[in-house]
Regions:
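Nucleotide-activated chemistry modules centered on ATP-dependent adenylation/adenylyltransferase
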Residues: 2-298
Length: 298
């Protein structure tokens, strides 16, 4: 009787274990959260747009958007603020992705803004800080009311304070007193005329999460994210790529180094890191061992 009782009890326990819901992994939880955010925005807003530069965060964001609405096409336009100082490999990648998935891309040009007198060229040649005006002009012209960005809270203090839904006023300004509480997965997209909401589906991701997701999903990236030989020069402790923007200067000398980029942006302020990481797995090992954030390192 005792043996029979134990056998029956064990069978019941095994049956419960077999039907118990499986716990999601860290990546599965982050993916589900991001997909929910994309669908929430599609339901709340009229003209959402995805900022797409060809950088790894925007690439992952687009991949998640495609998953969120598959097999239907992505219901959002893409927007890229082109500084005119972008890495050629990244621009080629951007155009290839847009063509492959038959997406609509709007390009806001910093050079056009300079020519129109909306912004002035900086003495140091950097155009990274000049992107705000053409971005806001594009948002106004196309009446975008939600703007997806690839910002993550682990990148820097300025981004750590952002909510997932970040309300911006008519001038694109962020006011902490006007931000709404975000309880669980409830998001408030209410906004007034001329205002818009920045949306950050990757807020809770880390750089390592992004790379592990890239590895899991087999996502292709621009080649400059992996180790390659490149002409660079040293300025303020960073390896910068020479270009029409104004480098190198004075005693700065160009040399060839094996480098890769942890983040991509304006060539004038995006530094490379010396690296031998040729594959996604190599990059994951490198990032896991790093004690500097990508912003701090580059």
């Amino acid at each position: 009787m005792w043996v029979a009782h134990m056998t029956t009890e064990t069978t019941v326990i095994d049956a419960r274990a077999a039907t118990a819901p499986r716990r999601l992994t860290q990546l599965e939880t982050l993916e589900a959260e991001a997909i929910h955010i994309f669908r929430e925005v599609a339901g709340e807003f009229e003209r959402p747009v995805v900022l797409f530069s060809g950088g790894k965060d925007s690439v992952v964001m687009l991949h998640l958007a495609r998953k969120a609405f598959w097999p239907a096409p992505v219901p959002f336009t893409l927007l890229h603020v082109d500084t005119g100082h972008n890495f050629p490999e990244v621009i080629d990648y951007r155009d290839a992705v847009v063509a492959a998935h038959r997406l609509r891309l709007v390009v806001a040009s910093v050079q056009d803004a300079i020519d129109a007198g909306s912004v002035r060229e900086r003495p140091d040649g950097s155009r990274n800080a000049l992107q705000t005006v053409p971005l806001l002009e594009a948002i106004t012209t196309h009446r975008f009311d939600a703007v997806f960005g690839g910002g993550r809270r682990d990148e820097e203090k300025a981004r750590a304070k952002e909510r997932v839904f970040s309300l911006r006023d008519e001038l694109g300004q962020w006011d902490p007193r006007r931000q709404r509480p975000e309880l669980w997965d409830l998001y408030n997209g209410r906004h007034g005329p001329g205002e818009h909401v920045r949306v950050f589906p990757l807020s809770n991701w880390t750089e390592l999460d992004v790379w592990r997701y890239i590895e899991r999903e087999g996502i292709d990236l621009p080649t400059i994210y992996y180790a390659h030989e490149r002409q660079v020069f040293l300025r303020d402790g960073m390896w910068l790529a020479p270009g029409d923007w104004g480098g190198p200067r004075g005693a700065e000398t160009v040399e060839r180094r094996i480098v890769r980029y942890r983040t991509v942006g304006d060539m004038s302020c995006t530094g490379a890191v010396e690296s031998e990481a040729l594959t996604v797995d190599d990059v994951i090992v490198e990032v896991a061992a790093s004690r500097l954030t990508e912003r701090g390192a580059t």
